[in-house]
Amino acid sequence: MHKITLSERMKRLFYLFFVLSAACTNKPGFPIEPKIEYLGMTKSSMIQSSVNGDSTLIRISFTDGDGDLGDKDSLNLIVTDSRIPGFPEKFKIPFVPIEGSGNGISGEIGFLVYSTCCIYPDGSACFPSTQYPTDSLHYLIKIKDRAGHWSNEIRTNDLVILCQ
């Protein structure tokens, strides 16, 4: 008969404790409304264009307590140009399936925003200007989960549009 030493017993207890604690997942302490934070943009300036001539990648982080982000059918990432607040651009966050017992999720989202036209004081746009060599804007961003909860709204750094 093989006698189990104290150190072997401790190893087995530690292993059992590790397996049990790994099997028990706690739901993260995130609220059910999505929360987003601005991480950055790949460019601080772009050349004006009305046909997607230039772009920048915007990165945000997110948390969502019930993990119901993304939708197959709706546009749920809203990006608003600070110069034209009534006309937001809408994007689709890919569907994230709800899995496991701790349904809270966190991660990062990156999306391309294409160049836009310079808007001049007289309201004209999209032509080169020596009088107004640059225009600037920032984006306001928010997301919505499948339950209809809106996130907080975040602001990007300023982006300079080169009016060439």
Question: How would you label these PLM feature ranges?
Answer:
Residues 1-9:
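N-terminal secretory signal peptides that target proteins for export/translocation
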